[in-house]
From Swiss-Prot:
This is 2-succinyl-5-enolpyruvyl-6-hydroxy-3-cyclohexene-1-carboxylate synthase. Catalyzes the thiamine diphosphate-dependent decarboxylation of 2-oxoglutarate and the subsequent addition of the resulting succinic semialdehyde-thiamine pyrophosphate anion to isochorismate to yield 2-succinyl-5-enolpyruvyl-6-hydroxy-3-cyclohexene-1-carboxylate (SEPHCHC). Binds 1 thiamine pyrophosphate per subunit. Its cofactor is Mg(2+); Mn(2+); thiamine diphosphate. The keyword tRNA processing does not apply.
Amino acid sequence: MRTENTATLNLIWGALILEELARIGVQHVCMAPGSRSTPLTLAAAQQTKLKRHLHFDERGLGFMALGLAKASRAPVAIITTSGTAVANLYPAIVEAWLTHVPLIVLSGDRPPELLDCGANQAIVQPGIFAHYAKQINLPTPDAHIAPQALLTTIDEAVANQTRPVHINCMYREPLYPSELGTPILDTESPYLKPLQTWLQLSRPYTQYGKYKQVSNPSDDAIMRFVHGKGVIVAGTLTPEQDPQQLIALSQKIGWPLLTDAQSQLRQHPAAIGNIDQLLQHPKARNLLQEADRVLVFGGRLLSKRLISYLAEQHWHSYWQVLPEQNRLDPSHNAKHVWHANAAQFTALNWYRSSSANWANTLITYNDELHNLFVRNIDHGEFGEAQVVRAIANTRPLEQQLFIGNSLPVRLYDMYAPVSCCTATTYTNRGASGIDGLLATACGLAAHEGKPTSLIIGDLSQLHDLNSLAIAKSLASPLVIVILNNDGGNIFNLLPVPNEQVRNDYYRLSHGLEFGYAAAMFNLPYNQVDNLADFQDSYNEALDFQGASIIEVNVSQTQASDQIAELNLWVKQS
């Protein structure tokens, strides 16, 4: 292969980048069409170690990559052309940065001489993601730059990264080689001669050891910490942290475990899952105010009542366990932060508390709320909370559950049922936007083909409508449950001072339904208005090998009215 040709050298650099990323652990590459990224696109087309995913909209593509990275627990590469194509990744990059999800953006770019001079589709791309991505700027491919220098640059940029990396790749024309040789990384190429050993192996050129800072308390510190009335709080926890170990820890110490919607433990029968509602239950709140020690795993709590409880309580000792060095406490409590994941921290030598079982009455109160929700939600009027509970109760071991922002995730946090088993649960609660939710769910479903359910609001679905094209490409079950209350009815729960203002400037009623959208993308579609029909449609959709839509139409005030009614019941308990 001749390397003096610009198009050929561009292609070699693209192939070196993708080969090294595959060796580092990347399994998926998400690609949008474009000309300036051609060296990366052609290299990806021949790369057999990566699974390719294509979509025409970079915003949805970025969120699909986010879902793939969440599910695979490995970095995912994204290829885009130059210009606003890169900018459209910004929302997904922000979400990934805040939640420590590794995405690797490979953006094609114009060479330096075509920037700031009116050249077509040319913007300043380095630094486009501000502090939400590590930035690497590659020069235009040059035969005088050793290929091993390119590999070590990639290795250093990506190794041990838990957050997004932006690798900006400048290419001069011509971009398209006259012929596409196989393989691109030809062992006979003089340019690749320094990499002969690397080409014959399958490991990265530079192998970085795993870097993980872990800090643990001493046995004496643990003994002093558990000496008193305490609570354990499970915040946002990923499946690989083995959150189930918190159940055993709670039982060993003798402290109640209060669980957030994102903890993987919200429905566990041994946890106090209804904590959001219990904090407005007078007897339960009075009991919880006796606690003077708290052990928090993770952060990004959903319940404002739980956040307020942690902020207002006078803690003798406040410990927080985080896998990364973050500040995840908007209340700025005085505390000791330990760097470890939940599995590591629960494996320490824990002692029985001197006040073990001090809050056992919480179990009774939690059961009271369980019975209240069965009676008033499951056997009450058809509505959003009833559907959320039905999904959470249906075949959980078979599937993964992605819960959309705004009202759906709050309904799950407030009213999820107790269950012997729970689906693996995902959310996008870093920046908590309503964009890209369907695309993220598509990424989750695409990784291994596990049946996946998405609970999403109508405005969120309208926001991500063209990601139905990604959903259409799936060959495994993705059940898209749209809770259509005709607008942003989360604002019914907020103190907007005037109903007309609420309707005109916050709720944004649209009067739309999603049947025609389903037809446009040729997706199976059902609209339901009762629980029996929903359950029949839902079970059928879980068995369908592809994406399907179930639309649940309710009034604008159904959920908010029911929440107000249930709040009244709880407060009078």
